């Protein structure tokens, strides 16, 4: 399935039906009086967050969504039928913006969340509503109100527990493929990964979601390369795993380049917990490895972990470190939520070790 994380769509709710001008006509009843019914209400346009979707690709082929109009009122005080609603089904994590692409309307962060984007127009009153002591036979009725129309932007920010960041060819996709059932494209050239990939990792019977985004390069926050476009997908993560390839000539520069881009990106990524790991260590001898590990430790001011997705070395330790941070943050979130006033499979242990080789505003419908 192709990945699309931004879409522009046009929505229009239904017009209300017109009220009817009608008079009661029955045998032997000379002055039956008005009996025009009201028009039906136009349909609404709703958005709903659903599981099982991780792309907005459906909105590439359909950009116009229109609810149906309410039917007109009829004689004998019959009210017209309401128009049918239209619901846009989007992945959990989708944000809805106004046409300016900056004003946030709603953030769809939980499964089943619904929000009304455009309300249908009310139906018009039939002439029976306008009967009075001074006007026993009104010959007019109200037209239905027009529905709302607008252009909106849908922007998807995937919800994952941990995000993988690093330069191109740092081994992020290889890591994701090794610890989850995800099968991202892997090749020995930069920007093999062109869109984010998600996978579910399991360690010690605990599951968490990993997000792999395209590699970052210097100047990414200014639009250089493609990684900056996808940084929004790791904004919601609880921890970042920063991979630095042992094949880099200068591992310290490789680390600081990405760290600078995270800091320059306006999304609070520099404040997230970070685990640093020297990847692809199977390609170096022991002396060279020690030298690069020391340089990386000096650059990041913490002891980096060492991993090889090919041999499996250090992979379990990294997963456990990620799990510990995620569990700690989840516990903090749960505690924070509990203090608020209430309002209305793929296991690494099973992987063979090779010595060589390769997350409506529920507003009910009215």
UniProtKB/Swiss-Prot annotation:
Q: What GO CC annotations are associated with the protein?
A: cytoplasm
- The OBG-type G domain is annotated at 160-327
Location relative to the cell: Cytoplasm
> Where, by residue number, does GTP bind?
166-173, 191-195, 212-215, 279-282, 308-310
Stretches for region Disordered? 333-366
Q: Which UniProt keywords apply?
A: Cytoplasm, GTP-binding, Hydrolase, Magnesium, Metal-binding, Nucleotide-binding
What sort of enzyme, by top EC class, is this? hydrolase
Location, primary (coarse class): cytoplasm
Alphabetized CDD domains for the sequence: Obg
Question: Which EC number(s) does UniProt give?
Answer: 3.6.5.-
List cofactor names only.
Mg(2+)
Matching InterPro entries:
G_OBG (IPR031167), GTP-bd (IPR006073), GTP-bd_Obg/CgtA (IPR014100), GTP1-OBG_CS (IPR006074), GTP1_OBG_dom (IPR006169), GTP1_OBG_dom_sf (IPR036726), OBG_GTPase (IPR045086), P-loop_NTPase (IPR027417)
Q: Mark out the compositionally biased spans (Basic and acidic residues).
A: 347-357
Q: Name one GO molecular function term.
A: GTPase activity
Quick check: keyword Magnesium in the entry? yes
Q: Which residues bind Mg(2+)?
A: 173, 193
Question: Biological process (GO) annotations?
Answer: ribosome biogenesis
What is the disulfide pattern of this chain? none
Q: Pfam families under this entry?
A: GTP1_OBG, MMR_HSR1
Q: In what residue span(s) does the Obg domain sit? A: 1-159
Primary role: An essential GTPase which binds GTP, GDP and possibly (p)ppGpp with moderate affinity, with high nucleotide exchange rates and a fairly low GTP hydrolysis rate. Plays a role in control of the cell cycle, stress response, ribosome biogenesis and in those bacteria that undergo differentiation, in morphogenesis control.
Return the similarity comment: Belongs to the TRAFAC class OBG-HflX-like GTPase superfamily. OBG GTPase family.
Subunit text: Monomer.
Q: What is this protein called?
A: GTPase Obg
Source species of the chain: Allorhizobium ampelinum (strain ATCC BAA-846 / DSM 112012 / S4)
């Amino acid at each position: 399935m192709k990945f699309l994380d931004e879409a522009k769509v046009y929505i229009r709710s239904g017009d209300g039906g017109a009220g009817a001008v009608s008079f009661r006509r029955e045998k032997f009843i000379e002055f039956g009086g008005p009996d025009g019914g009201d028009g039906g209400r136009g349909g609404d346009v709703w958005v709903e967050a659903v599981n099982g979707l991780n792309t907005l690709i459906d909105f590439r082929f359909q950009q116009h969504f229109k609810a149906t109009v309410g039917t007109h009122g009829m004689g004998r005080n019959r009210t017209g039928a309401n128009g049918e609603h239209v619901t846009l089904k989007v992945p959990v994590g989708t944000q809805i913006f106004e046409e300016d692409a900056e004003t946030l309307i709603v953030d769809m962060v939980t499964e089943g969340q619904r929000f009304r984007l455009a309300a249908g127009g009310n139906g018009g009153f039939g002439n029976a509503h306008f009967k009075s002591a001074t006007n026993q036979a009104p010959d007019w009725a109200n037209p239905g109100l027009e529905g709302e129309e607008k252009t909106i932007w849908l922007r998807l920010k995937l919800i994952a527990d941990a995000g993988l960041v690093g330069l191109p060819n740092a081994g992020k996709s290889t890591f994701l493929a090794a610890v989850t059932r995800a099968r991202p494209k892997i090749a020995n050239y930069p920007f093999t990964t062109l869109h984010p990939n998600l996978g579910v990792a399991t360690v010690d019977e605990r599951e968490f979601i990993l997000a792999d985004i395209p590699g970052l390069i210097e100047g990414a926050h200014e639009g250089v390369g493609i990684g900056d476009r996808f940084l929004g997908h790791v904004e919601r993560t609880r921890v970042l795993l920063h991979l630095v390839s042992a094949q880099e000539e200068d591992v310290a520069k490789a680390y600081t380049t990405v760290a600078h881009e995270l800091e320059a990106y306006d999304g609070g990524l520099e404040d997230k917990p970070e685990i640093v790991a020297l990847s692809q260590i199977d390609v170096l001898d022991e002396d060279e490895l020690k030298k690069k590990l020391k340089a990386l430790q000096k650059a990041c001011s913490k002891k980096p972990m060492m991993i090889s997705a090919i041999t499996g070395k250090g992979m379990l330790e990294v997963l456990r470190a990620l799990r510990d941070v995620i569990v700690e943050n989840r516990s903090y979130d749960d505690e924070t939520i509990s203090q608020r006033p209430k309002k209305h499979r793929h296991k690494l242990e099973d992987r063979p070790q090779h010595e060589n080789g390769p997350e409506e505003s529920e507003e009910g419908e009215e």
